[in-house]
Amino acid sequence: MSEIVVLKLGGTTLVEQRQVLAEVATIARRRPVVIVHGGGKRMTEWLDRLGVPTRFDGGLRVTDAAAIEVAAAVLRGVVNSELVTALHDVGVDAVGLSGVDGGLLVGERVAGIGLVAHVVGIKRDLLDAILVGGQVPVVAPLARDEAGIVCLSLIHI
């Protein structure tokens, strides 16, 4: 398998930039691609709609138990599925999953901001199995920490 391209798409990109998705399709025809996505704007909309308070510290969302429940639902059930559908529309055989599926992402908690973690481990064989099948994994930014607790993952590429 040739070198894997990892693309990080922000929440604004998902909704507003069809051209970006067409470019992703072009890249995916040439090389294996893994997509990770954000969704902070959509999370904020849903948190506000449901009356869950949102607070930021140094630009990072402070995420408590109520917020992670909403975040997981929005990132997996709304943002990820919309992105997978949009990629299918431009000819990409995308498969949606989150970092907690199959233990894909392991996180280490960031002190002081609740259920937020830096990614410190990746279950590469799960990604490889999807890629070998010619599909593009689309990963929602969730991880389990060392205690197995679901956290919002910070993915820096």
Where are these regions (language model features)?
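Short, ordered loop/turn segments at secondary-structure junctions
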Residues: 10-12, 38-42, 59-61, 99-102, ...
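N-terminal glycine-/serine-/threonine-rich phosphate-binding loop
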Residues: 1-35
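Conserved small/polar residues in nucleotide/adenosyl-binding loops
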Residues: 155-157
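Active-site histidine-anchored catalytic micro-motif
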Residues: 26, 31-34, 40, 56, ...
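N-terminal glycine-rich anion-binding loops that anchor highly charged ligand groups
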Residues: 4, 34-51
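Short pre-catalytic strand/loop immediately N-terminal to key active-site residues, enriched for Gly-Thr
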Residues: 146-152
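Ligand-binding beta-strand-loop-alpha-helix segment within the catalytic cores
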Residues: 48, 52-136
